[in-house]
Structures are given as C-alpha cells and as structure tokens.
C-alpha cells in the first residue's frame, strides 16, 4: 500500500487547531469500546499507516508521539474508517495494557453524577 496515495484518496479535511493542521482520531478496541480521542496531523497518520502502530499529535507538547513509546501500552492498528465529512477518523486497534495515562483501560473513566465528577469503574474498569 502506498501511504501517500492512500492519504490523498481519503480526501481528509484537516482543521487548523492551535496553528496546526489536525484531524480528530477516535480510537476503539476490537469490541468497539472507546479507548481515547486524540488529534493527528498528516505525519501521524502516515506513520500509523507505515508502521501499523498508532501515532498521534500532542497539542500540549507540539510533537508527534507513538502511543506506548514510554509505557509500552501500544495500539496495533487493525482497521480504520473515515467519517462522512472527512473530518474525523475511527481506528480499531489491538490495545496492549491500558490506553489512559492515568492507568485506566479507557480515558473515559470519569462519570458526572449529581453535578459531581467521579472516577468510576461502571463504564471501564482499571486493568
């Protein structure tokens, strides 16, 4: 697969966010549980397609990063989809370990209940 050609054919609508051309990346496991939402620039997308492992763009650190490069909790790409508008991508991955830097399987472990923010295992549990 020619990565340059694939990216071009996707006809993506990168958005200008904090001075960078970015696209929303939604990442799910094989059971379609949402693991995380992050941004990608074109380089991160190309690296993901070239290596088969998820790469993202950090808006806070202003750099490309490979998921799990420090923790070992890598995400192996299985397949991906483009949304109807071309402004978001959905990635299905094989998750090794946890996805969240706080030690939870998913970044969506906070629940809003009675106006309060609570950490809960109802949606995803710590593994």
UniProtKB/Swiss-Prot annotation:
Positions bound to Mg(2+)? 83, 85, 87
Cofactor binding description: Binds 1 Mg(2+) ion per subunit.
* UniProt pathway annotation: Amino-acid biosynthesis; L-histidine biosynthesis; L-histidine from 5-phospho-alpha-D-ribose 1-diphosphate: step 3/9
Report the principal subcellular site.
cytoplasm
Q: Which reaction does it catalyse?
A: 1-(5-phospho-beta-D-ribosyl)-5'-AMP + H2O = 1-(5-phospho-beta-D-ribosyl)-5-[(5-phospho-beta-D-ribosylamino)methylideneamino]imidazole-4-carboxamide
- Give residues annotated as binding Zn(2+): 84, 100, 107
Which keywords does this chain's UniProt record carry?
Amino-acid biosynthesis, Cytoplasm, Histidine biosynthesis, Hydrolase, Magnesium, Metal-binding, Zinc
Q: What protein family does this chain belong to? A: Belongs to the PRA-CH family.
The protein in question is named Phosphoribosyl-AMP cyclohydrolase
**Upper taxonomic lineage:** Archaea, Methanobacteriati, Methanobacteriota, Methanomada group, Methanococci
What would be the name of the gene that encodes this protein?
Answer: hisI
